[in-house]
Amino acid sequence: MGVILEGKPVAEKLEKEIKEKIQFYKSQGVIPTLCIVKVGKNAEAEAYAKSIEKFFSKIGINIERKNFNEEISLVDFKKIMKELEEDSAIHGVLILRPLPEELERGKAFQFLPTKKDVEGVTYENLGRLLVGEDSFHPCTPQAVLELLDFYQIPVEGKNVVVVGRSISVGKPLSLLLLNRNATITVCHSKTKNLVEFTKKAEILIVAIGKPYFVGKDMVGEGQVIIDVGTNVVDGKLVGDVNFEEVKDKVEYITPVPGGIGVITTRVLAMNLLKAVKKVEA
């Protein structure tokens, strides 16, 4: 059986570092504060917000909420973002998805203040990532790096295959790995003969959003498998990789739940503390 790369010890290490930084800022009279912006009603978005609130409250980060009805105009939304940019007591801003069609069409995320963009979704932060400059990294891709670093799995010179090309995971993750001198192949729904790529990977990262998509016939001996998928099947959280099928064939594998997901919220907190430093400078 392959070694299971549990996310919990990674999260605990990061949490310890985060708490130390929070105490430092509080000793300077600064209370790290995240503003969560929600438009309309969505049960999944609200559940996500509450999970952040619960963890952040536990470690000493202040949370503010701004809720708006789905009729809010793009002009008014832009004004709100400007107010949050100018509010020195707010260090980070997180906009929950989904947004109403008008806001999505109007690229509302681009009104986020760049130095408070704790999810790294603005064009400026994504551009900085592209050229390898200091920026806020999207949380899930950074969580993958934190896990690889913790378990001392090098990526330099490695053949890494990323299955999935979303702007929130696949694309930024491929750039982060490229910046670490990995050799990257990005596969997606239009890739022909996908199995030829997945079986040859030294490190296979799956973020395609399809439960149990990768089975034993798609992996090779001795691989590192990172499952970024979060899908609900019969009321249970499952990954994009069929864990039970694959675990005995590969060298390392992350579980779902208990893998990347538990690290992601800690990365969000790390990004907020990075924003505190920028805002308070």
UniProtKB/Swiss-Prot annotation:
Keywords, sorted A to Z: Amino-acid biosynthesis, Histidine biosynthesis, Hydrolase, Methionine biosynthesis, Multifunctional enzyme, NADP, One-carbon metabolism, Oxidoreductase, Purine biosynthesis
Gene Ontology CC: cytosol
Gene Ontology MF term list: methenyltetrahydrofolate cyclohydrolase activity; methylenetetrahydrofolate dehydrogenase (NADP+) activity
Catalytic function, reaction form: (6R)-5,10-methylene-5,6,7,8-tetrahydrofolate + NADP(+) = (6R)-5,10-methenyltetrahydrofolate + NADPH; (6R)-5,10-methenyltetrahydrofolate + H2O = (6R)-10-formyltetrahydrofolate + H(+)
EC number: 1.5.1.5, 3.5.4.9
InterPro entries in the record: Aminoacid_DH-like_N_sf, NAD(P)-bd_dom_sf, THF_DH/CycHdrlase, THF_DH/CycHdrlase_cat_dom, THF_DH/CycHdrlase_NAD-bd_dom
Pathway assigned in UniProt: One-carbon metabolism; tetrahydrofolate interconversion
Pfam hit, one: THF_DHG_CYH
Keyword NADP recorded: yes
Keyword check for NADP: yes
Residues that hold NADP(+) according to the record: 164-166, 189, 230
Subunit comment: Homodimer.
UniProt record similarity statement: Belongs to the tetrahydrofolate dehydrogenase/cyclohydrolase family.
Function: Catalyzes the oxidation of 5,10-methylenetetrahydrofolate to 5,10-methenyltetrahydrofolate and then the hydrolysis of 5,10-methenyltetrahydrofolate to 10-formyltetrahydrofolate.
Protein's name in the database: Bifunctional protein FolD
Origin species: Dictyoglomus turgidum (strain DSM 6724 / Z-1310)
Gene name of this polypeptide: folD
